[in-house]
Amino acid sequence: MKKIKSFGGKSLGGGKQEKLLKDFMKMQEELQKKMQEMEESFSEMEVEASVGGGAVRIVATCDRRVKEIEIDEDLKEDLETLKDLLAAAVNEIMEKIEKRREEEMSKITQQFGIPGLM
């Protein structure tokens, strides 16, 4: 088998190269499996955002699905305030979802020695 130079300039014999490739493929498969499991778990992970002192509250899952919206009865009379608070709550929930997803992704990438992937 032909020797191939690695990135460090050293020659890798055929056996070493094959083992490295097999190890890499196995790690890639494990990483893909973990990532798929994580994606599936996002439908169960909930985050909550509350704005206006609790006047508007949103609960959503980390797969970006809104489960619940609560609006204080007093906001019925003030449509402009309601729209502002609703926009703020949606923005906050999206930020929280992304942060949670990044935290979960970081847990997996650290297991595989891939810091800063997300």
Curated annotation (Swiss-Prot):
The keyword Cytoplasm applies. GO terms for molecular function: DNA binding. It is found in: Cytoplasm, Nucleoid. Keywords: Cytoplasm, DNA-binding. InterPro entries: YbaB-like_sf, YbaB/EbfC. The keyword DNA-binding applies. Its main location: cytoplasm. GO terms for cellular component: bacterial nucleoid; cytosol. NCBIfam families: DNA_YbaB_EbfC. Binds to DNA and alters its conformation. May be involved in regulation of gene expression, nucleoid organization and DNA protection. Belongs to the YbaB/EbfC family. Homodimer. This is Nucleoid-associated protein CTN_1899. It comes from Thermotoga neapolitana (strain ATCC 49049 / DSM 4359 / NBRC 107923 / NS-E). The lineage of its organism: Bacteria, Thermotogati, Thermotogota, Thermotogae, Thermotogales.
